[in-house]
Amino acid sequence: MHCPFCNADDTKVIDSRLVADGHQVRRRRECLVCHERFTTFEMAELVMPRVIKSNGVREPFNEDKLRNGIQRALEKRPVSTELIEQSINRIKSNLRATGEREIMSKIIGNLVMEELKLLDKVAYIRFASVYRSFEDIREFGEEIARLEK
């Protein structure tokens, strides 16, 4: 690794530790030329499948888009950021577990709805009403009835 101080190629690892619940490695390094010390963080780069939208357009998976949709549904609801992040991580893990290089956006939407159903029923109804394009109050009632079963 290049030294950020003198740009030398020769650095050595002094200490390594697992951080972020074992998802990252923190390394203390020392430059063999200028002897400055610095910290690096290393984590696995996991490839997410491309998303095939309902109109057939393919686009890279966008975690921010996923997070924004979930947060919008949970707006002003009593759900912690930690629980939201756990849900996002479960969704991403499920998508990677398919082993597919491309995945339909409908599958992502269904995973989001399942997570919201566990987190907050009101947020689930909010998301479902937009995702499934509810036309009238009857559709809300039908979805609420399904939730109560």
UniProtKB/Swiss-Prot annotation:
A zinc finger (unnamed) spans 3-34. Its cofactor is Zn(2+). PROSITE patterns: ATP_CONE (PS51161). Binds 1 zinc ion. Disulfide bonds: none annotated. It comes from the Bacteria. Residues 49-139 form the ATP-cone domain. Keywords: ATP-binding, DNA-binding, Metal-binding, Nucleotide-binding, Repressor, Transcription, Transcription regulation, Zinc, Zinc-finger. The keyword Transit peptide does not apply. GO terms for molecular function: ATP binding; DNA binding; zinc ion binding. One of its GO terms (biological process) is negative regulation of DNA-templated transcription. It holds the Pfam family Zn_ribbon_NrdR. Negatively regulates transcription of bacterial ribonucleotide reductase nrd genes and operons by binding to NrdR-boxes. Belongs to the NrdR family. This is Transcriptional repressor NrdR. It comes from Tolumonas auensis (strain DSM 9187 / NBRC 110442 / TA 4).
